[in-house]
Structure formats: C-alpha cells, structure tokens
C-alpha cells in the first residue's frame, strides 16, 4: 500500500497523512507517514500493528496477514501555528498491489515523448545512488517547462529519518508543491501505455544490476515511450536511466520482454501543472554576490550581507557561462563550492585563475535556493618580454 498527497503548506503549517488497514478481521491502529511541509524536517516513521503482520517502512505499508488486507482508511491531520494560514490538501490517493494481480497488456503503441536527460555523475553526490528519484522527478516537471534543478527537488523531499531521497510519497508531495498533480501507483503494461498515449511520461521502478553491485537493486527511471523494431519484429521501451555514465547516455532502449521482467510495477504519475493552483516551489531568492577581503564571496540582498547559516547542510555550486544554450539549467556543468565558517563561499583556485562569468547556486535543506550572477576578474595578461637589442649594421665588422 502506497499513499500520496499533494498539499499547500505555508510556513508554520504542516500535513500528516495516516492510514489503517483491515486485515485478519480487525482494524490496525493508525500508521503515520510522517509530518510533512516544504520547510519542515520531514521524517518517515517505522510502525507496525500489534501482531507485527502489518508494518509501515518509509513510504510503503506491507500486509503480511494471510489473505492480505481487505480495507483501508485514510486520515489527514492539518495543523498550524499561524492564525492567518492553514494547509490545504488538493490530492489524496492510495495505491494497492493486489495479491492476485490480473495484469493486462493493452494495445501496442509506437510513441516517443521528450524527456530531459540527467545523470547521477553530474549532480549532487550527497545522496549517492538514491539521487535517481529526484533526477527523474525534475525531468518529469521540466518537460513541461518548469526548469527546476534536481537538487531543489532532492532537498524538498529528503527524508530526514534516513537522510535519503528514496521516499516516493515525499517525492509526489514535492511535485505537488510545484503545482503538478502527482501520485504513486501500481501499473501494468496497459496502464503504462495509457499514460504515454495521454502524453505523460512517468517514473518507473526497475530492478537491475548496477556496476559494482553484486545483487540487483531498484532504480527509478523515466519512461518516455514505446516502439517497434521491424528488423527483429520486437517491441521495445524508451527509458531515461539516471545511473548512466553521462547525460548523453541517459536515453536508452530495452526490449519490452526484458523490461516487463525487471519492472516492479511501482510507478509515479505526474500530470501538467494546473494554472489556477498556487505553487509553493520552486522557492528562489535572487541575490548579489560580493567579494570579501579574504577572497571568499557572500550572498547579498538589498545591500545586506546574507551569509549561509551555520546549520546549512545543502548544496552549493557554480556553473560557468560557456556560451551554450542548454535545454534546461540542470544540463549545465556544476562544480561544488566550499562554505567558509563565516557563511561565505570559496571558488576553486583554478576558477579564480581563469576568471569568467558564473552563476552561483545554494540550495538549503528545505529546497530554498539562493541564485546569484558574478563575473570573476580576468587574470592579468603576462607582461611582454623586452625586445633583444639589435646591432647597428654600420658597426658590424666584415668577416675576414
């Protein structure tokens, strides 16, 4: 059982979604998916029923009772510390994997959708391989013109209980904060084909082998279409694999038969943004960047220095303007920056030596991002060597 919610939760408000399951002729107690808000330290909760046969871990409730569960109930708690603000839930969904799942194939489809390509190696390494889900979620939104960074998604959905970004419920909630209807689902081939037919790419969970890993691991990929190879009379699927070595290798194909063997059935659906819905994310602050006497750089707002706080545990990086018109900001090449004890940022010595125009980004642990542009001074040109003195031809003695 997987539960999803999309909600607006202003500052000093939060949402808590709970569920209970009818299994073994009795209702379990309420199981909480954790208190949630964009600027709140979100933590998933491990819980279980009294007999231990129904348990919640992260974003999934598992029913081990013989015969499974036959009923579920959902409860949403809204809380606020501000008399003038309240959270609002726009979408609430529950997805169940049946014990006896009669899967359908649907009608063959030949359609390809655009989906931006992002790979793990080009983005924040803090979350390791579990950065795959924020990369796919950013791609799903950016195909509609959002231009959000995967790091913004990652820190807006991070599960503080595990310091990871693998919680799909928090991923759907983060996309909902950006204004996109988004929910978890269990899908068969017919469902996947229906999503692509409706012009919607989706995130799919695939069990596959990763280089350096002994056992297969779950990877979130972006499904962007289906096709047919007339040469070998075989169907195939079009995927974005964020574990590829580079952005250019993210687009890949897989034989449909192989895909259905590795596909777990878990998926995340995302629909276009609703214009009438106010979005809480992305939360960006335009800043200036000023140089201190020690060579570090500080964000500045309205003439006031805005140092990164002591508890800053997010991502700070810069991208050099290379003259290339990238499809999205996330396609740029990022280089990490070091935070100073005073809250400033340090450019690498080689970048200071090269100079140039740079964009600087700092995403904090809530997903809020400071953005600034700066032009580093160009290095001085080396002084020209003095010309060697030339002899006057009239003073040169003829050879003997």
Task: Name every feature range the model reports, one short phrase each.
Residues 1-98:
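Non-cytosolic beta-sandwich-type ligand-binding/adhesion modules
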Residues 24, 66-82, 92-106, 229-300:
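Noncatalytic regulatory segments and standalone regulatory/sensor domains
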Residues 152-276, 338:
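Conserved active-site-adjacent core of cysteine acyl-enzyme catalytic domains
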Residues 273-306, 320, 324-327, 379-382, ...:
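Short, compositionally biased P/S/T/A/G/V-rich stretches that sit at domain boundaries
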């Amino acid at each position: 059982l997987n539960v999803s919610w999309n909600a607006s939760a202003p500052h000093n408000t939060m949402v808590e979604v709970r569920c209970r399951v009818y299994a073994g002729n009795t209702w379990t107690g309420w199981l909480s998916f954790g208190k949630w808000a964009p600027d709140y330290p979100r933590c998933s909760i491990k819980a279980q029923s009294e007999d231990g046969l129904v348990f919640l871990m992260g974003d999934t409730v598992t029913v081990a009772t013989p015969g499974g569960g036959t009923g579920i109930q959902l409860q949403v708690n809204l809380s606020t510390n501000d008399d003038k603000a309240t959270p609002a839930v726009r979408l609430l969904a529950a997805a169940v994997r049946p014990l006896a799942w009669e899967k359908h194939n649907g009608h063959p489809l030949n359609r390809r959708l655009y989906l931006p390509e992002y790979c793990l190696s080009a983005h924040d390494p803090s979350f390791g391989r579990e950065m795959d889900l924020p990369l796919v979620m950013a791609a799903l939104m950016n195909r509609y013109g959002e231009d959000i960074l995967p790091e913004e998604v990652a820190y807006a959905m991070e599960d503080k209980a595990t310091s990871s970004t693998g919680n799909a419920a928090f991923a759907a909630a983060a996309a909902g904060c950006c204004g996109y209807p988004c929910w978890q689902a269990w899908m068969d081939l017919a469902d996947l084909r229906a999503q692509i037919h409706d012009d919607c790419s989706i995130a799919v969970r695939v069990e596959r082998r990763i280089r350096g890993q002994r056992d297969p691991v779950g990877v979130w990929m972006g499904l962007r279409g289906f096709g047919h190879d007339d040469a070998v009379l075989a169907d195939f699927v079009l995927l974005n694999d964020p574990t590829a070595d580079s952005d250019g290798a993210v687009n890949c194909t897989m034989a449909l038969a192989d895909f259905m063997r590795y596909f777990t059935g878990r998926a995340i659906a995302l629909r276009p943004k609703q214009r009438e819905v106010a979005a809480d994310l992305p939360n960006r602050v335009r800043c200036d960047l000023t140089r201190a006497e020690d060579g570090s750089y500080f964000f500045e707002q309205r003439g006031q220095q805005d140092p990164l706080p002591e508890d800053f545990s997010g991502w700070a990086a810069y991208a050099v303007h290379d003259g290339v018109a990238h499809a999205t900001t996330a396609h740029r090449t990022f280089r990490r920056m070091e935070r100073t004890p005073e809250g400033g940022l340090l450019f690498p010595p080689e970048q200071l030596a090269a100079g140039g125009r740079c964009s600087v980004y700092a995403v904090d642990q809530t997903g809020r991002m400071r953005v600034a542009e700066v032009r580093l001074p160009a290095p001085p040109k080396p002084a020209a060597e003095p010309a060697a003195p030339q002899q006057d031809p009239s003073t040169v003695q003829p050879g003997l």
